[in-house]
Structure formats: C-alpha cells, structure tokens
Amino acid sequence: MTPESVMMMGTEAMKVALALAAPLLLVALVTGLIISILQAATQINEMTLSFIPKIIAVFIAIIIAGPWMLNLLLDYVRTLFTNLPYIIG
C-alpha cells in the first residue's frame, strides 16, 4: 500500500462525502434563507421558527435524493472492495 494509493482513496472518499452532503446542506441553506427573509419582513424574531421548515425540507430532500445518494455510496464501496486486492498488494 503506497502513500499514493492511500491519498487516492482518501481523496475519492472526500469527494463522495461532499457529493452526499451537498444536496442536503444546500436545501437547508436555502430553506433557512427563505425563512430568515420572511422573519425579517414580518419582524418575527423567533429563533426556533426556522428549525421545523428546515427539518421538513431536508427530510423531503432525503426522500427525493435518497436513491441517488445510496447508489453513489454503493458504487464507491463496490469499487473500493473490488480494488482492495490491487491496493493491498
């Protein structure tokens, strides 16, 4: 196992983790921004008001993007296990 192969595996793992987290984080960011704009427009300064819409939006995003996320993760793990004998020795 060379340092290059370890770096390659780590880089690929970080890319997959970023690809899995990005859609959910973007949905939470956009939902929070919309709720904050509505709170500023109506002058409602309740901090807990944005949590429920964010949770609902992220849950819907998981339902919609879940199969894609699962396929991406399974492809990565399948590739990792397939290449494991070549990486080890």
UniProtKB/Swiss-Prot annotation:
Transmembrane annotation, as ranges: 16-40, 55-75
Protein localization: Cell inner membrane; Bacterial flagellum basal body
UniProt KW Membrane keyword: yes
Lineage top rank: taxon: Bacteria
UniProt keyword annotation of Cell inner membrane present: yes
Function: Required for the assembly of the rivet at the earliest stage of flagellar biosynthesis.
Listed name of the protein: Flagellar biosynthetic protein FliQ
Organism: Escherichia coli (strain K12)
